[in-house]
Amino acid sequence: MKNAFKDALKAGRPQIGLWLGLANSYSAELLAGAGFDWLLIDGEHAPNNVQTVLTQLQAIAPYPSQPVVRPSWNDPVQIKQLLDVGAQTLLIPMVQNADEARNAVAATRYPPAGIRGVGSALARASRWNRIPNYLHQANDAMCVLVQIETREAMSNLASILDVDGIDGVFIGPADLSADMGFAGNPQHPEVQAAIENAIVQIRAAGKAPGILMANEALAKRYLELGALFVAVGVDTTLLARGAEALAARFGAEKKLSGASGVY
């Protein structure tokens, strides 16, 4: 078993991604052919469930883009279900400390290394037990990325980085800026300093730093600092702003929204 995304991070090859929030397999397949290295299927803020994640994994599978799935929480039951339908790389939100990071890793591993329940006869991940020795190979194919999104998590970054089985640490600029008192303004100098310091610290620890940033200049800056998995846009934003701009060019009465969202 292989995990191309995990292998790329280990090799130090920067991976450029796109966030998927439309919760739709048709749009996921459309974007899978766009040329991004990875696509994030969002179960935290988008209206996804296990079934919709499954259909998007199936839609992306024939393409080079690698799927990353974000569950709604660091929940071992939800993680088990997502792994069984075929997710190999998970982005776990709101990890605050090393204990929570260890719990995330344990949820992705079969015993004795972890607590993942065995249900491979029912699982797409094992191709319904058609993959020889799946139970003995699966642990090594898992890629665990944890999100740090608060001042508390930032203060615990060193201990989180020491957790065995953590492949990467993703900095959440929207929640971090809100927690630091600058909601909606991740470009505030204090937030930017925290992000840049974290990227350097994560890379120095031998882990992969990641972030979502639609501002092209900042995204390139993070890559220069050593970020290895960077999402540079969101499908919902691309569709909304693109549609508004097209309508405006043809004299639509509705003014452009002037959206002020983080992404």
UniProtKB/Swiss-Prot annotation:
The record marks D84 as: Increases basicity of active site His. It comes from the Bacteria. Binds 1 divalent metal cation per subunit. Its cofactor is a divalent metal cation. GO terms for cellular component: cytoplasm. The record marks R70 as: Transition state stabilizer. It catalyses: 4-hydroxy-2-oxoheptanedioate = succinate semialdehyde + pyruvate. Substrate binds at Q147, A174, D175. GO terms for molecular function: 4-hydroxy-2-ketopimelate aldolase activity; metal ion binding. Pathway: Aromatic compound metabolism; 4-hydroxyphenylacetate degradation; pyruvate and succinate semialdehyde from 4-hydroxyphenylacetate: step 7/7. Keywords: Aromatic hydrocarbons catabolism, Lyase, Metal-binding. HAMAP family: HKHD_aldolase. This is 4-hydroxy-2-oxo-heptane-1,7-dioate aldolase. It comes from Salmonella heidelberg (strain SL476).
